[in-house]
Amino acid sequence: MQRSTPKEMYHNPQNVYTAQFIGTPPMNIVSNMVKGIQVGFRPEKTSLIDPGDAVLSIQGRIITKEQLGAEMNYSIETAFGKVMVKTEDDIEGQECRLYIREKNVFAFGEDGNRIPVTEEIKKALEQVEKGV
């Protein structure tokens, strides 16, 4: 169990439980993207418009779209399961692509504990877009 301030737990979660406990909607955790690794990214740190420096790009289909003031909450089906995106990006149509910058990607081992995002993991994430 991680014991620290809510701000520290949000920005630097040490395990999957903490990563999903802090934040609304909770952090997306994908288990079948990179072998032996659980990949995490926060809905509000995910873009539907290419920022040009994303380390991870995932094709998806919008299931639901909910406007909450200036922000939109999307539920998106991907090859890796359903994920949530919270953004100001207002996308038309059902097909979309999710973009996540390197600084917003978290890696967790099979035991749920945080591990560093190594060069090997980054290369594996870059291959996801290529369908490798």
Residue ranges with predicted function:
Residues 1-35, 43-44:
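Internal alpha/beta loop-helix hairpins
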Residues 25, 35-132:
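Non-catalytic connector elements of ABC transporters
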